[in-house]
From Swiss-Prot:
It comes from Sus scrofa. Residues 270-469 form the VWFA domain. One of its GO terms (molecular function) is serine-type endopeptidase activity. GO terms for biological process: complement activation, alternative pathway; proteolysis. Residues 35-100, 101-160, 163-220 form the Sushi domain. The active site is at H526 (charge relay system), D576 (charge relay system), S703 (charge relay system). Monomer. Interacts with complement C3b; this interaction is dependent on the presence of Mg(2+). Its main location: secreted. The record marks R259, K260 as: Cleavage. This is Complement factor B. It is found in: Secreted. The gene is CFB. The unliganded VWA domain has an inactive 'locked' conformation whereby the scissile Arg-259|Lys-260 bond is protected from proteolytic activation. Residues 477-758 form the Peptidase S1 domain. Residues 1-25 form the signal peptide.
Amino acid sequence: MGSNRCPRLGLVPLILGLLSGGVSMTPLPEARPQSPCSLEGIEIKGGTFHLLKEGLVLEYVCPSGFYPYPVQIRTCRSSGSWSTLQTQDRKIVKRAECKAIRCPRPQDFENGEYWPRAAYYNLSDEISFHCYDGYTLRGSANRTCQVTGRWDGQTAICDDGAGYCPNPGIPIGTRKVGTQYRLEDSVTYYCSRGLTLRGSQRRTCQEGGSWSGTEPSCQDSFMYDTPAEVAEAFLSSLTETIEGVDAEDGHIPGDQQKRKIVLDPSGSMNIYLVLDGSDSIGARNFTGAKNCLKDFIEKVASYGVKPKYGLVTYATDPKVLIRVSNPKSADADWVTEQLDKISYDDHKLKAGTNTKKALLEVYNMMSWGVNNFPDNWNRTRHVIVLLTDGLHNMGGDPVTVIHDIRDLLNIGRNRKNPREDYLDIYVFGVGPLVNQENINALASKKDKEQHVFKLKDVDNLEDVFFQMLDESRSLGLCGMVWEHKDGTDYHKQPWHAKISITRPSKGHESCMGAVVSEYFVLTAAHCFTVDDEKHSIKVSLGGKKQEWEIDQVLFHPNYDLNAKTAKDIPEFYDYDVALIRLSKKLKYDQTIRPICLPCTEGSNQALRLPLTTTCQQQMQELLPAKDVKALFVSELTKDHRKILTRKEVYIKNGERKAACERDALQAQGYEKVKVVSEVVTPRFLCTGGVIPYADPNTCKGDSGGPLIIHKKSRFIQVGVISWGVVDICKRQQQAPSYARDFHINLYKVLPWLKEKLKDEDLGFL
């Protein structure tokens, strides 16, 4: 590998993140044995072994698909003998052997059945889940046992939607206590003996209908995350943190290719790099760790943001090389230069390991920000990255400093505003010596995010950084807005497009649309006629005076407004969707940016969904079988000027769906229609009405605009405004209860979107 890459660091395990001491699965000896432990009779049947820590630790290694039984690690005791081979039940075993990896069975499954039922499952075995009547399946209906000992896919959950929060489910291998999902109700998870719980043991139903913490799983000591899984999950969470600064802290993003954020004096995000330089690391691994941190800085810089960096190296005592108060701390190139200058010999004379003292320096830097910028400190996000072997031998438990940091940043105190988004602690355990319980205790726990990882070896760690740096897909800025108080309407709705069609002797018509890529605007097909010429169609974006000319309008091939005139249905809006191709490529800026389309990598990332998430699973996340909060943007006139206003509606996707659709028969021109399915096909989403809330209705000029779901500070288009039962803008009185609006469901026209947008680098799933 080149010198600018994170090299192979040998077999000493490294931790990227925060790791408390005592990382071996079996405690490491406090003193060297009087004589070396003998290697006679320690072989493992079906595998091999190698020595770590200068012969003080032995690791058993098995072929792919097998794991060492009864233990993976043995330590050389002070008596000169190896630690005993015994199971989790303390049963003594005479000889180690490699056993076939199996996946755990479901401990329980609520409101449904799974098949086949077995005591255990071998690699490639499949299991299927089905729900009882009245319950809807979320997650994966079919799952396969993988070579890692984990099931692929996502937790299968049968839910009737009756709770304030959705059923959190029972991940395979866990047991759940608690079946009430009301506000502030809690559920608790447990693992079988010998397995370690990763994630949140206790989760609480919060305001807004989400669960605190992160979904738990039960891990065996032989289980590892793959580099692809780690890179994807880490990038997804890191991107959310970085782009959240963009969206929420009021800094205007630049164009798509040169995204930069000019921070105010307090900074919008601080990243603290803490590097272990104790004698247990070694010079070669210290140098390799530096290069990994350089890769990390490069990845952050690729997002175009400029966080402030703090840099600390430590052994017995810490050395603060860069403070976030330094004016140059936001210069990534300068930070990299300072990182290059540090040497392993800096701590040669005092080479103990005092992780707690190093983290106290991080605490002190945070305190500086709180004390010096009282008006801005609560808008600064903090990310801590520590590289160490995790073996602290002085100073006490570093976890206590994490509690102090949370208190300082006012995190977790206020139930209505817990501020968890303002601190991210990523824990990367590498190698066989990792104590999974310890690293889990330190990692951040956030819904649908993963902050704790365990990698097999440093080669895998290198692969993680390689995939982070070399992934070719766009991480995307779709669905991002600038919500600052000084932002214009188009900062807050940067995808918004106004479409004007001029027809000689027939006047002027207006529609709306949404920017979905650098060349395309998505809108409704009925805005156009076959006689419209492209020079008569103009698109306005970003609130600018400039008008964009178009190259062509692409209609869905199944759209035919007159398809049912023979059945006395004068207008039929099925497949009412069109794409406008602009004649020139857009240059994104703070007022012109794309909205997220469903079933793309960008929308998956926006929702913080796992690598394996399918289009169907994403749809279940965005459009569950219940009323779904959404919004559309309407143009109003106020004080003689046009303003854009968001209007909140509910998509009737559950028990109210049928009643919503039936009201379509109240529309003018549909008096003779007897069967609602003649005009409302499965491709429509329905909003409006007065139950459970009085929804605002669209006006005629809103046609073609996006129906949007706002989630995780991102905006994802799920529909195109098509038609309404009543044009309420022409009425002076209150809208009737049957005033409904219908929108083309984008999930139902995805094949067409994928075909027409295949060259737009959107990464359709």
